[in-house]
Every structure is written in structure tokens, then in C-alpha cells.
Regions:
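Bacterial N-terminal signal peptides
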Residues: 29-41
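C-terminal functional modules
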Residues: 310-364
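Bilobed "Venus flytrap"/periplasmic-binding protein-like clamshell domains
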Residues: 59-70, 80-95, 129-130, 149-201, ...
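Sec/Tat signal peptide C-region and signal peptidase I cleavage site
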Residues: 42-47
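Bacterial N-terminal signal peptides that target proteins for export
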Residues: 7-8, 15-32
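Extended ligand-binding regions for polar small-molecule ligands
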Residues: 86-95, 157-161, 165, 170-171, ...
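Extracytoplasmic small-molecule ligand-binding "clamshell" domains
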Residues: 48-125, 328, 351, 355
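Acidic, polar ligand-binding/catalytic clefts
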Residues: 89, 93, 97-166, 223-246, ...
Length: 364
């Protein structure tokens, strides 16, 4: 055999061995991928420390507003009513199937994030705007936007003010620790109009100061102005100016470092929205769970168990939430709808299919 023939024989043998090795490796990789996929499908997410602690104590601790109609305000029996209060109750239903297993902690704007970071509360549903600096500097996470708003001003009708530019030299009530402080200062500076801020710790204090004439205007998010006005003795004496000066996307806030708890609160919120998108209501949830052939509806209502398994919740968790509290639109209408004192049109808080900004990511 010549040297060239020996080289051809050797190289061909080596090539065949290498090809066999590569084929074996590819087969092993495919088997590992399939095994991992099967494991992920069959293994529900482990509960994080926050969910474990909530289950151990037997109730959710939820941070809410100190008092503003529409979001969180005690009724005549001392029970908290409002969208944020109901969203807290919904988390309790998702975990315990019991809307009463929640303790509300009323927090001012200046103390809310400290209370969450220290572990005093498990979650904030408290008219809290997502901003870049809050996201990157506080050690907290914004779960998902559930309400879209903007900064506005409310004045007494007889003040003769129709736009913010008319408010030169005005004294303006603001809430300490909110985005509204900076928004107001930035806007008045941009139009070269001087003003005097007066800061208060709570919304009810600022409202009282406005009604007593210690301020010419009250500046905060328009939805909260509508709530404040609805609680005044003579709401018709007050005007909320039409101009809006900021984007104020509200969402639940949670501590960083517990991804499982973040996922639960995030996808719970989307489920409430998804229920409205699919037409599932308090009244028809039971029937739709029993009769719907829509795969998305069956997943949402727990006929098939994968959504509950992935969050380590009962398969019927979202069904229980909607059956107890309603879908997003029902919750909104209960606290802001035309039959309420607040009477705030949905505007950007309509579903995306109706020209709004609200939609759920796919629950699948």
C-alpha cells in the first residue's frame, strides 16, 4: 500500500469515527432537550418565599391608599372599597379562594415604598406610577400596568381659571412623595409661570386645605381629583381642568428577588383583564366554565390545569377571582362607572379592542 493509500484509509476511518461521534452527540442532545421539556411541563413552579409566608400566616397583607374614592376608601362600616382594594382581594382569592383573607395597610405616598421594601406589606396596589428611577433605584418591581392616568389640576369654579397658563402666582396643593411634585414644577418652569407649592402628607389633608382656601388649586392625577371631588360637600363647585401634563401608569409594586411572587401578581392582573376580553363575568363564569369550547376560555377558567400549575395555584384560581369580584370592566364600573359618585369615563382604560390601552398578554 502506498503512503497516499494509507493516508486515504486512515483519514476515511477517522472521518467515519468522527461522524459516528457527532451523530451520537446530536442524539444525546435531542434526548436531553426532550427530557427537560417534559420535566418543565410536569413540574409546577416552586412557591417563592413571599407566597410561602402568606400561606403560613393565612392572609395577604396589601398596601393601599390612605383614602381616595375610586381606589381605596373606607365605607360606613369601615370596609375598604375601591379598585385597588378589590385587586388586593382578588390576589387573596387566587391564593385562598377567600376574599376576606387580606389585611389592608393604609400608606401615605412618602412611606409606601419603604413599607414594601421592609416587608411590612406583601404587595402595593396603591395608585403607584411606574417610573425609571423607581424601577432601578428602590429594589422594587412594577408588575403590570392596570390603570392609565395623567396629572391634572382642580380649581374652584369662581376662580376664573380655564387653563393652567391662567394660574400665574397660584398656590397649589400637592402630595408629598408623589410624581406630581416634579411634574408640576417641571411644567410651570417650561411655560415660565411662577407658582407656590404647598405639600401635604395625605390626600384628605390637601383636599381640606383646598376647600378652606389655603390653596388655589389641587394638583394630582386626574382620577384621584375625580375621587376627591366626589367626596366634597358640593362637587359641582369644582372643575378639573382638561389639560393633562404627564403619563401616570399605575401598577402593583413588589420587592425584587422573588420571581415566583412577581409572576403570580403579574399574571393574576392579566387574568382579570383577559376575562373582560373573553366576555367572562361574575354572572356567567360558572356557565362558561361548564360549556365553553374556546381553548383560551377553558385555560383561563381552569378546565385545563396548566395555568394554575405554573403558578402553584388551584387550577380554578382565575375562575374563582372572576366569580367573586368580576372582570376588569366590572371592577372599573363598580368604582368609577356612571352610576358612581366618581363617574370617570374609562378613556385610555378601555380595552384595546375598544380604542383603549388595556390588554392582557396571552395566557398560554
Amino acid at each position: 500500500m502506498t503512503a497516499a493509500a494509507r493516508w486515504r484509509d486512515h483519514s476515511g476511518s477517522a472521518f467515519n469515527q468522527g461522524a459516528s461521534t457527532m451523530a451520537w452527540a446530536r442524539g444525546l442532545s435531542a434526548a436531553l432537550v426532550a427530557a427537560c421539556a417534559t420535566f418543565l411541563q410536569l413540574t409546577p413552579a416552586a412557591a417563592g418565599p413571599t407566597l410561602d409566608a402568606i400561606r403560613a400566616r393565612g392572609l395577604l397583607v396589601c398596601g393601599i391608599h390612605t383614602g381616595v374614592a375610586g381606589f381605596a376608601l373606607p365605607d360606613s362600616r369601615g370596609e375598604w372599597q375601591g379598585m385597588d382594594a378589590d385587586l388586593c382581594r382578588g390576589v387573596a382569592v387566587a391564593i385562598f379562594n377567600d376574599a376576606t383573607k387580606v389585611r389592608f395597610v393604609a400608606l401615605s405616598s412618602s412611606t409606601r415604598f419603604t413599607a414594601l421594601g421592609s416587608g411590612e406589606v406583601d404587595v402595593l396596589f396603591r395608585t403607584s406610577t411606574q417610573t425609571m428611577l423607581r424601577d432601578v433605584t428602590l429594589g422594587l418591581r412594577h408588575a403590570v400596568t392596570y390603570f392609565y392616568d395623567g396629572h391634572g389640576f382642580m380649581v374652584r369654579n369662581n376662580l376664573g381659571v380655564s387653563k393652567v397658563a391662567d394660574m400665574r402666582g397660584a398656590t397649589i396643593c400637592l402630595i408629598q412623595g408623589t410624581t406630581n411634585e416634579q411634574v408640576t414644577a417641571d411644567y410651570f418652569r417650561s411655560i415660565s409661570v411662577p407658582f407656590s407649592p404647598v405639600l401635604y402628607e395625605r390626600t384628605d389633608q390637601a383636599s381640606a386645605a383646598l376647600q378652606a382656601g389655603r390653596c388655589d388649586a389641587f394638583g394630582t392625577d386626574a382620577s384621584q381629583l375625580a375621587g376627591v371631588r366626589s367626596s366634597m360637600p358640593r362637587p359641582s363647585d369644582w372643575t378639573i381642568l382638561e389639560e393633562r401634563f404627564s403619563k401616570e401608569p399605575y401598577g402593583a409594586y413588589l420587592r425584587r428577588g422573588d420571581d415566583e411572587w412577581f409572576d403570580l401578581v403579574r399574571w393574576y392582573t392579566y387574568a382579570v383583564i383577559e376575562a373582560e376580553e373573553q366576555g367572562v363575568t361574575r354572572a356567567n363564569a360558572e356557565e362558561m366554565r361548564r360549556t365553553s369550547v374556546n381553548p383560551n376560555t377553558r385555560r383561563l377558567l381552569g378546565v385545563t390545569p396548566e395555568l394554575g400549575q405554573s403558578l402553584k395555584l388551584d387550577p380554578a384560581w382565575a375562575y374563582n377571582v372572576v366569580r367573586t369580584l368580576g372582570n376588569y370592566g366590572e371592577i372599573y364600573d363598580r368604582h368609577f362607572g356612571p352610576t358612581t359618585p366618581v363617574n370617570l369615563p374609562r378613556g385610555p382604560n378601555r380595552l384595546w379592542t375598544q380604542g383603549g390601552l388595556v390588554y392582557a398578554l396571552p395566557l398560554r
